[in-house]
Structure formats: structure tokens, C-alpha cells
Amino acid sequence: MDYNVKDFGALGDGVSDDRVAIQAAIDAAHAAGGGTVYLPPGEYRVSAAGEPSDGCLTLRDNVYLAGAGMGQTVIKLVDGSAQKITGIVRSPFGEETSNFGMRDLTLDGNRANTVDKVDGWFNGYAPGQPGADRNVTIERVEVREMSGYGFDPHEQTINLVLRDSVAHHNGLDGFVADYQIGGTFENNVAYANDRHGFNIVTSTNDFVMRNNVAYGNGGNGLVVQRGSENLAHPENILIDGGSYYDNGLEGVLVKMSNNVTVQNADIHGNGSSGVRVYGAQGVQILGNQIHDNAKTAVAPEVLLQSYDDTLGVSGNYYTTLNTRVEGNTITGSANSTYGVQERNDGTDFSSLVGNTINGVQEAAHLYGPNSTVSGTVSAPPQGTDGNDVLIGSDVGEQISGGAGDDRLDGGAGDDLLDGGAGRDRLTGGLGADTFRFALREDSHRSPLGTFSDLILDFDPSQDKIDVSALGFIGLGNGYAGTLAVSLSADGLRTYLKSYDADAQGRSFELALDGNHAATLSAGNIVFAAATPVDPSAEAQPIVGSDLDDQLHGTLLGEEISGGGGADQLYGYGGGDLLDGGAGRDRLTGGEGADTFRFALREDSHRSAAGTFSDLILDFDPTQDKLDVSALGFTGLGNGYAGTLAVSVSDDGTRTYLKSYETDAEGRSFEVSLQGNHAAALSADNILFATPVPVDPGVEGTPVVGSDLDDELHGTLGSEQILGGGGADQLYGYAGNDLLDGGAGRDKLSGGEGADTFRFALREDSHRSPLGTFGDRILDFDPSQDRIDVSALGFSGLGNGYAGSLAVSVSDDGTRTYLKSYEADAQGLSFEVALEGDHAAALSADNIVFAATDAAAAGELGVIGASGQPDDPAV
């Protein structure tokens, strides 16, 4: 018989409290021996009935609650409820209840407008007592916005069936099976719950999970576990089919349980391992698709380990034993270490049978003396677009890294290693290995930085480097299709380099650990077929075109003009005049007293678009000259006020003449000289223009950087210095300057005066899971300088949360940090470093914060973070 709640006074208008009316209908059905209590479409508000164990609505024997469908019939907790409610709908506490349930409706916990823990569905007799609820059926029910659990059938329940239902956005677990006997969860979905999707706990046994889905939950997708009390472990659990993906921790966790089977499931994209067996016995993992897990932590796809509870409630050590992993397809992500891994903690008697394992460092890594692997197929590891760690086997194979900064290890055998794009580290291992480079972008340097691979164990007696696809024809000076060999200053690293750049400014470069300069030859480098060029065959190639020319002089002195393009000019004998013209040219004077002329700033410069400076390969300061008179430079200096600055590269192999002043097109003059000529350059070998005195006291204009790694200088006046993108260096000098490094890891020096260091975007100075990209202030003076973070919304100093910034000092006391521990949607947390210990001096007097509104400040709650994500539902 049906009992319509509206016949008992329920309104379903979303405003009135209908609890008493609905309960009256339930009681009437119970008094008549049973029936269905029907709620027509509408929103029925309910309040707490009294004690937490009273819930809101209490079902009785043979009574079923039914609505018009999920989302059509909604039972919602009233606004302002401020007490614990163990079940908006529940069975009576301490009474054995049978043949009852709920279907076709939604329970809404209204967590945004209520206080204290509220659960959606709850049933069970009483904890630790021998009674039980029986024959419970829940179908097509949605539970949402509970501050506690969604569905929480509790101890003990015999023969519960919960199917075709949904739990989402609840504060703890979506579905709990606490001491269930002989029940079934089928075709349910749990998503966006703060803790686990499904939690099978507290002595549950003979239980079936079939075709359920859990995704986007904060903890595990599905966990089977004993819980925090010393009770009998869950046993005889079947998990058949379904999907468990994109959860914060494991896809499936089996902890302190016995005889659990996980089969035919799709488990992928989870934060840690796909499946973790933790202090359990007799677990079977059969025929699953386990792939692309370890998204937020380095982990194996399947982890088998023991659980130490010697300091816990049982005092026992639970060894993982007799796990069978059979017929699974296991594919790793960039962070996946192994297909299946045992921990070296006593775990034993594991059997791996007939699995297909790909894309991991190693297919299986077992420690148990009685653990075995048979029939497992593992393809050579292949990389992704992420930062992969790929380890080969004991046979020869081809390992390709793909994009990303990869680590490749060939293991034994004659392997072929191809790191692909990115800055890769390559280890051939035992055997005669080949390191292949198919594209210039795979290992190169450019104006954007160095992206060269490093070979860690090159053996010149048997290994080979294959650069044939790049067109290099032999060893030489790094030009005209040759590769130059050079050593680091300490002799611990060898480099193979080309000095010819492609259209994107990339020059091939490869590093080898160790000193191999004397042993590298055509015997261990695979070159392309050489096409010899006779330089004497070009009689008078003196004037170039707008293309990339190679122009050769003779034994006489002549003028060689490159024109447009990235040209190569060779003077050979005689006192030559070389003028590369526009483009990034390479100039070799040869013998004789040569002059290298620069008539236009565009001939050799850098700008926001990149570096287009010429390189002089054989400048002899005792006889050669640089002619910059047409550009108006008047002498050597700091690169300002018409002077040229001299600097040397970090490795001492290249000297630069630079102006830091730009023309209307943003171009600054720069020319490079091979070798260290810093001490030898002077007015004797540089032809300057007649100097024009400059008043250094004139206040400068704003200095604006590019998206490259800029070095920007102020004047003696006050100005804004804006870095833009790139890892910039900003120098204010005197005056009250404003320095804004922009994006990139910048170094800021205000100099004299009361300077302001501004941070307008969180990306300008931050840390993230990808690394630390914080700016560093080199000379902060707390007595007069300021740090402006007002645009970022920070309101004061504090613990780094709730809009505050925390102050900390490095262990050695040489650096102070201002940090926020709150990340934005991209995972960026603000951080800036100050040289020196300023912890005691930092305050609102020298930090510009955003305006605060105390009345609008709300309390930030922490949801679902007990610190013990594997704890049971209690």
C-alpha cells in the first residue's frame, strides 16, 4: 500500500519543515504492517529529530521511501541546522530492522548552510552488539553535499543491496560498507567526495562490488580496510569491473584484509599507485587495465607492501602474502617506477603470471624469496611528453624518450638510445650502445638557454654517437658541417659542438661525462657522407647577397662584405677588412692585420626578438682592429652613455663588447669574440668615434626588458625598470627606483635610494610542483626599501595562509623568504627571497599589502584532511 506524504501535511515547497509529516506517513505505513511512503516531485525540507542517532527520518520494518526520481524528489536539510545528524534517513538505533529501503530520490545535506557532521543514509543495529539489520534495498538514490558520509550502512547489516546510485561532493566518503555481510554495491558512482569514493571497512565479509565507478575523489577511489579499531579484518570481497580514476591517492587500496579479488576494472590517472596491497593476504588482481597512474607522486603502478601496526591498536605486523597478479595490462605514466613492485619488508609469495607491462622503468621488482614472475611480456620502455625515467632490460633494445627531460638507462645489451626533445641524461649500460640524435632540437643550445643531452657512461672503445641525420660530416672547428670537441675547465666533461645555428637559432651541442677529447674520432661517431669543399676554388667571392653566404678571401688583403643573411666570412692571408652586414655572421680574418667593421647597429645586435650578434673567431688584439666609429661609440665603459662594456662568458671562452642602450627599434649593439680578450681590448685595437660628453645626473627614462634573459640598468635618477619574461637581472643604481622583474627567476638590485620591488602577478615569483621560480632581492634595505605585493591580495604577515605571508630564514641565516603556502589553480604559490637575514625587520612598514576588510574575512575550514586518509568510517 502507498502512503502519499502530502496526505499527511507535507508541502514539498522548499521552505516548510516537512519532517513531522513525512515521519507520520512512515509510522502509518509501519502500523499497517508495511508499505511504500511516496514523495511526489518537490523539495522537502527536514530538521533533526533530536539526538544524533535519531537522524531526521526513521524507517521501520517493511517500509520503503520512494520519490519521483533523482533530482525531482529532494529531501534537504533545513538552513541553519547546527547539530550532528547520523543519517538524514536511517533505521532506528538498537532495533533490528528488516525489509526496508529507499529509491528514486535525492538527499541533500546543505553543507554550505549547516554546522556539524551530517550523514545522508545510515542504517545498522548498534556497534559491538549481536543484532543486525536485514534485507535493505537502496536504488537510484543521489546523496550530495553532506558534511559527513554519503551512504553509510553500518554494523551489522545482512544482505544489503545498493545499486544505480550516486554520491558526490560529500565531506567524507561517498559510499561506506561498515561490517556488511553478504551485501552488494552495483552500478554506483562516487565522485568529488573529499575523502574516498568507496570505503569497505570493519569486518565486512562476503561482499560484492560490481561495475562501480569512482573518480575525482580526494582520497582513494576504493579502499578495503580494517579501520582504526582492532576488529576482524574484511574478507572475501569481490571487486568486479568498474572504473577508478583521477582520485587523489590510490585507485584501489586493499589494507589489512583477506581474500580480496580485484578483477576486470579500469584503474587509471590516480595520484599514487593504481592498486596498493598493504598488509593483506590472499589478494588477487586479475585481468585489469591499470595505466597512467602516479600522477602526483613517483610510484609503481601496482605496489605490494606489508603494514606495521606494532605501535597501533593490534600491536601486530601484517605481512602481505600470497598476492596473485595475473592477466593484467599495466602501462606506466611519466612518474611510474615499476609495473609491479614488492617492498623489501617481508612481503612474499607473490605470483605474477601472464601480465603485459609497458612504459615503466622496470616491469617487476620483487624482493620475496618465494615470489615469482612467469609469462609476463614487457615491451622496451617508450617515453611520453613528460619527464620520463626509462630503464631497459638485459637484452639489446631501442629506448626512445620523446619530449621532456628524460633519464634513459639501457641496462645490458647493445642498445639504441634516443632521448628525443628535452634535456636528457643517457646511460647506455653494459654492451656496445648507440646514442642517436635525429633532430637538432633533440640536443642543442640557443639564445633561450642550453638544452643539450648528457651521456653519462660513453665508452669510446665500443659505443657510438650517431649524428648522421643532422648532416655533420666530421670533426673540425664546429663550422661548415663539422663538430668541434672541447673540454670543460675542470676537464670532467667533453662537448661536441656545432657553431652553426639553424633558422631558430639552435646549434647542436652534446655533453659527455669524462674527458674523451683524445679518443673521439670517426671510429665512434657516425657522420653523414662528406662533401669536400676546396676554399681556393672560390676566386673572389667578396660581396655577399641577402642569403646565408660563405665568402672566402685570398692570400691578399681585400674588403669582404657579407650583405644580408647569416654569413661566414674568411679573410685568409693579407690585411683584410671584413664587414658582415646584417644577420648573425661569423668572421675569420686569418693571417694579417685585419679590421672588422660595423657600420650599422642592425649588423650586430640583440633585441627583444633575440640575439643577432656577429662572432669573430680569431681576433688578434696585437694587430687586428674593431671599427665601431660609424655607430658613435666613444670608448670603453659600463655600456651606457655611448660606451661599450667588456664582459667574458662564465667559462672564459668568449668575450663580449656590449652597449646596454637601445635604438628606436629596441636594438642594442653586441659583438662576440672567441677567446678571453678582456684584458687586451683598448682604444689601441678599437676604432671609436669622437666622444661627446654626457651629463650622468640626467634622470633616465623607463627601462623595459624583453621575454629573454635581460640585464637592465638604471641611471643615477629614479625610474621604473621592468623585466618582462625571462630570468632577468635588474640594477637600479641611484635614485628611488621601482623594480618589477616580471615573469621568470629574476635578480633585483635597487642600489642607492628608497627602492620599491613590485610583484604584480603570482607567476612573477613563485614555486610550484615543477620547481622554484622565485625572484631574489640582492640588497634590500628594510629602513627605506619596500616590497609591493598589494596586487596579489596579501593582507599582512602571518603563517602563510588566509592571505598572509610567512617569514622564514635559511638554515645558514644568509637568506630570508616571504612565502604563501596557498596555491592558485595552476599550483603556483608566491615566494620571494631576500639576501641576508631580515626576519626581525620585515613589517607592514616596508611591505605594501592589499587593503583589508575585516568584516568580510571568513574562516577557512579544512575538510577531509584528518591526516589519516585510510581511517575507517566511524
From Swiss-Prot:
<feature type="repeat" description="Hemolysin-type calcium-binding 3">
    <location>
        <begin position="419"/>
        <end position="435"/>
    </location>
</feature>
<dbReference type="InterPro" id="IPR006633">
    <property type="entry name" value="Carb-bd_sugar_hydrolysis-dom"/>
</dbReference>
<dbReference type="InterPro" id="IPR013858">
    <property type="entry name" value="Peptidase_M10B_C"/>
</dbReference>
<feature type="repeat" description="Hemolysin-type calcium-binding 1">
    <location>
        <begin position="383"/>
        <end position="394"/>
    </location>
</feature>
<dbReference type="InterPro" id="IPR050557">
    <property type="entry name" value="RTX_toxin/Mannuronan_C5-epim"/>
</dbReference>
<dbReference type="InterPro" id="IPR024535">
    <property type="entry name" value="RHGA/B-epi-like_pectate_lyase"/>
</dbReference>
<feature type="repeat" description="PbH1 1">
    <location>
        <begin position="133"/>
        <end position="155"/>
    </location>
</feature>
<dbReference type="Pfam" id="PF12708">
    <property type="entry name" value="Pect-lyase_RHGA_epim"/>
</dbReference>
<keyword id="KW-0016">Alginate biosynthesis</keyword>
<comment type="pathway">
    <text>Glycan biosynthesis; alginate biosynthesis.</text>
</comment>
<dbReference type="InterPro" id="IPR011049">
    <property type="entry name" value="Serralysin-like_metalloprot_C"/>
</dbReference>
<feature type="repeat" description="PbH1 2">
    <location>
        <begin position="157"/>
        <end position="179"/>
    </location>
</feature>
<dbReference type="Pfam" id="PF00353">
    <property type="entry name" value="HemolysinCabind"/>
</dbReference>
<feature type="repeat" description="Hemolysin-type calcium-binding 6">
    <location>
        <begin position="723"/>
        <end position="739"/>
    </location>
</feature>
<feature type="repeat" description="Hemolysin-type calcium-binding 7">
    <location>
        <begin position="741"/>
        <end position="757"/>
    </location>
</feature>
<dbReference type="InterPro" id="IPR006626">
    <property type="entry name" value="PbH1"/>
</dbReference>
<dbReference type="Pfam" id="PF08548">
    <property type="entry name" value="Peptidase_M10_C"/>
</dbReference>
<feature type="region of interest" description="Disordered">
    <location>
        <begin position="401"/>
        <end position="420"/>
    </location>
</feature>
<feature type="repeat" description="Hemolysin-type calcium-binding 4">
    <location>
        <begin position="562"/>
        <end position="578"/>
    </location>
</feature>
<feature type="repeat" description="PbH1 3">
    <location>
        <begin position="180"/>
        <end position="202"/>
    </location>
</feature>
<feature type="repeat" description="Hemolysin-type calcium-binding 2">
    <location>
        <begin position="401"/>
        <end position="417"/>
    </location>
</feature>
<comment type="similarity">
    <text>Belongs to the D-mannuronate C5-epimerase family.</text>
</comment>
<dbReference type="InterPro" id="IPR011050">
    <property type="entry name" value="Pectin_lyase_fold/virulence"/>
</dbReference>
<dbReference type="InterPro" id="IPR039448">
    <property type="entry name" value="Beta_helix"/>
</dbReference>
<feature type="repeat" description="PbH1 5">
    <location>
        <begin position="234"/>
        <end position="256"/>
    </location>
</feature>
<feature type="repeat" description="Hemolysin-type calcium-binding 5">
    <location>
        <begin position="580"/>
        <end position="596"/>
    </location>
</feature>
<feature type="repeat" description="PbH1 4">
    <location>
        <begin position="204"/>
        <end position="226"/>
    </location>
</feature>
<keyword id="KW-0677">Repeat</keyword>
<feature type="repeat" description="PbH1 8">
    <location>
        <begin position="320"/>
        <end position="351"/>
    </location>
</feature>
<keyword id="KW-0106">Calcium</keyword>
<feature type="repeat" description="PbH1 7">
    <location>
        <begin position="280"/>
        <end position="302"/>
    </location>
</feature>
<dbReference type="GO" id="GO:0016853">
    <property type="term" value="F:isomerase activity"/>
</dbReference>
<dbReference type="InterPro" id="IPR001343">
    <property type="entry name" value="Hemolysn_Ca-bd"/>
</dbReference>
<dbReference type="GO" id="GO:0005509">
    <property type="term" value="F:calcium ion binding"/>
</dbReference>
<dbReference type="Pfam" id="PF13229">
    <property type="entry name" value="Beta_helix"/>
</dbReference>
<dbReference type="InterPro" id="IPR018511">
    <property type="entry name" value="Hemolysin-typ_Ca-bd_CS"/>
</dbReference>
<protein>
    <recommendedName>
        <fullName>Mannuronan C5-epimerase AlgE6</fullName>
        <ecNumber>5.1.3.37</ecNumber>
    </recommendedName>
</protein>
<dbReference type="InterPro" id="IPR012334">
    <property type="entry name" value="Pectin_lyas_fold"/>
</dbReference>
<keyword id="KW-0964">Secreted</keyword>
<feature type="repeat" description="PbH1 6">
    <location>
        <begin position="257"/>
        <end position="279"/>
    </location>
</feature>
<keyword id="KW-0413">Isomerase</keyword>
<dbReference type="GO" id="GO:0005615">
    <property type="term" value="C:extracellular space"/>
</dbReference>
